[in-house]
Amino acid sequence: MCSIGEDDFGDEGGVHAMKEESPLPEGATTIEQEICRKCNDQRAVLKLNQKEPQCRECFLHYVRHKFRASLGATKIVRRGSKVMVVFNGAPENVVMLDMVRHGLEQEAFKKLRVDPVVVFVGEDFIGRDQEGYEQSVREKVQILRQFGFPAYYTVLGAQDSCSIEDNCLAGKFIGDQDKVTKVLQGIKSITSKQDFIVQTRKQTYKAIAKKLECGYIFLSSIGLELAKTLLSDVSLGRGKSLALDIAFCDDRDEERKIIRPMRDLNPEEIEYYLKFAENQLQSVAIVDPYLDKSSLQNLTSKFVDGLQLSFPSTVSTVFRTGDKLGAEKIPTCDNQLEDDDHFATLFDKSLKLESNAEEPRKCKFCHSALDYRDSTTLFATEFSRMVSSRINVQLSHEEIIESTKLMEQDACKLVNAELEDDEMRQLKRELCHACRNILVDFDGK
């Protein structure tokens, strides 16, 4: 139980209660002529923040134990399960693949008992020319081959995959790439573009996992990334799905669960794992094509990074707070994209909607629980938007009162998706607030 009273928190929240520390050097501190405090035998090679000096073997054991402990403590992943491991070539992603390989090579008692299938989901066609895209694919495939796992290749938005040994991988999914590119070109704001990519990415993972008959999807998200995701979800209006977006297990789809076994690791541990691992591991930095643009996600990311420099416990505090949040369970069969549906159908008006009297319970796009009905928060947002567009100084007092009554009615109808024509009304009924914003922001032809 927290011992800090509510009165201790003013307008600045709990920031004033956090001890500000001078910026620490990046990574752990390499030390000399010290003995490892774990084994008391080998020479220490590093000292992580607030940790004792460690030798190379003890450090690798410590990091790998955190990975295995997250899987063992929850007992969600069953023995012998076929697991789809998502690959993108990032440092934390390469570390996860090496940990999986190391676990499979252990003796019977310590062996990681899963059947991994690696899937490389290409996204580099966004914001790059064909030559740059092909070069990026070749580079990442070369990194992937160092692990020796059975591996497949696909792209963002696709629903099928091919072996990485096939020729001309970058040219196999031109149609799927064009669909994603067309939608992104039609979305006006960078915030909605980035949100669309995140939601489509999850949809792609689940579609490929179903094709490969995998019940679990391993992602390499670490604590820093998940802390940023938590705050970004708040700013985007995805509070209903926030808990599952950062949880160890996202079980919105009970047949294909998303697992985040790297969530307890931090960037320093990733950096030094790559340095001290038995095998020389190659990785690449993931380049976000919209990183230098203005968006809610980019602003949140910079805010967290900046606060972390002065208050090193920021990420841990935000991340662990998210662990205390709950999420509503919705049956998988309710209102999600069917096998023959595709994300693009939401934007090209070809999605088939079933008109029925039942209230939808799950978002058609992101599959989070719907909670917009009679929402006072959304009502205030829509009403404020209407006041800005409809009220002007030339209106009389009586006209303002009459207009206010109409705006209240219209705002309520907008929140409950009752104001538009039949087709748009039915579509908005089946989307959460954040996914509605993506659709509203889309003006593609």
Swiss-Prot record:
GO molecular function terms attached to this record: nucleotidyltransferase activity; sulfurtransferase activity; tRNA binding
Chief place where the protein resides: cytoplasm
Residue ranges of the TM segments: none
Cell compartments where the protein resides: Cytoplasm
Gene Ontology cellular-component annotations: cytosol
Cell membrane found in the keyword field: no
Basic and acidic residues composition-biased segments: 13-22
Pathway: tRNA modification; 5-methoxycarbonylmethyl-2-thiouridine-tRNA biosynthesis
Positions of disulphide bridges: none
Coiled-coil stretches: none
Residue ranges with Acidic residues bias: 1-11
Record InterPro entries: CTU2, Rossmann-like_a/b/a_fold
Swiss-Prot/TrEMBL keywords: Cytoplasm, tRNA processing
GO biological process, one term: tRNA wobble position uridine thiolation
Function: Plays a central role in 2-thiolation of mcm(5)S(2)U at tRNA wobble positions of tRNA(Lys), tRNA(Glu) and tRNA(Gln). May act by forming a heterodimer with NCS6/CTU1 that ligates sulfur from thiocarboxylated URM1 onto the uridine of tRNAs at wobble position.
Family named by the database record: Belongs to the CTU2/NCS2 family.
Entry protein name: Cytoplasmic tRNA 2-thiolation protein 2
Lineage, opening ranks: Eukaryota, Metazoa, Ecdysozoa, Arthropoda, Hexapoda
